[in-house]
């Protein structure tokens, strides 16, 4: 699941999926999202700047993403990005004359009403090597439809390909039933012919097959 989530997040935040060199061949899949569906803010327009207009940005991007007949209903972002948005002066201005208690729920609902989309905060974490990082990166906002965005496709890993080509040598690899995934036990250290430690290596290769290439928008906002 972690691999699938990470691959999906890479696609949704960059329109690319890059596989680690160790078990994914170091390859990058570029889905070639049209330039009109991407924007990188700079200078006084980044959302951390007082001069930014994040609500107008979101409305403008929604219009662009819907030009070809699609319907964009969700603004996807990390928790840090949403916090930056809701603390911006243009958002605070929405509550200047309010007499009710301003709660986080009210702030989110008000922003959603203004931009015409639901804000979805993706705050999942993943461990890559020894580093824990966000599955969906900060400073990126992706507008998407509500519903199925495509499917996840599974394929043979480099190890499985070696097996199919008869190039495994003396490596002992076991298939996980019903999948392209493999399990390999690799000796990590040994002395006097006795194995002291082993690594159990499970490989899996999964990529998104999206159906939203003409109804999404990826913005880098900081």
Residue ranges and their predicted role:
Residues 25-104:
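Extended, solvent-exposed, turn-rich assembly/linker loops in the middle of proteins
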Residues 6-25:
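Short, glycine/acidic-rich hinge or "gate" loops at secondary-structure transitions
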Residues 6, 11, 31, 37, ...:
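Sequence-level detector for tyrosine residue identity
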Residues 92-222:
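Sequence/fold signature of self-assembling virion shell proteins
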Residues 1-2:
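Long, hydrophobic/aromatic-enriched structural stretches that serve as scaffold segments
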């Amino acid at each position: 699941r972690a691999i699938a989530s990470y691959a999906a997040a890479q696609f949704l935040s960059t329109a690319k999926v890059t596989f680690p060199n160790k078990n994914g061949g170091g390859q990058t899949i570029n889905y070639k999202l049209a330039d009109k569906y991407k924007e990188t803010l700079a200078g006084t327009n980044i959302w951390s700047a007082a001069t930014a207009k994040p609500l107008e940005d979101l409305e403008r991007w929604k219009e662009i993403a819907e030009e070809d007949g699609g319907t964009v209903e969700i603004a996807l972002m990390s928790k840090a990005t949403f916090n930056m948005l809701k603390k911006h002066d243009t958002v605070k201005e929405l509550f200047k004359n309010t007499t009710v208690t301003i709660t986080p729920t009210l702030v989110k609902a008000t922003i959603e009403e203004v931009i015409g989309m639901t804000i979805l905060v993706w705050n999942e974490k993943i461990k890559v090597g020894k580093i824990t990082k966000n599955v969906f990166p900060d400073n990126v906002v992706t507008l998407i439809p509500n519903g199925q965005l495509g499917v996840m496709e599974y394929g043979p890993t480099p190890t499985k390909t070696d097996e199919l080509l008869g190039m495994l040598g003396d490596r002992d690899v076991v298939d996980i039933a019903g999948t392209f995934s493999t399990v390999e036990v690799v000796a990590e250290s040994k002395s006097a012919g006795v194995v002291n430690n082993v690594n159990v290596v499970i490989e899996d290769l999964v990529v998104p097959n999206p159906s939203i290439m003409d109804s999404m928008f990826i913005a880098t906002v900081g």
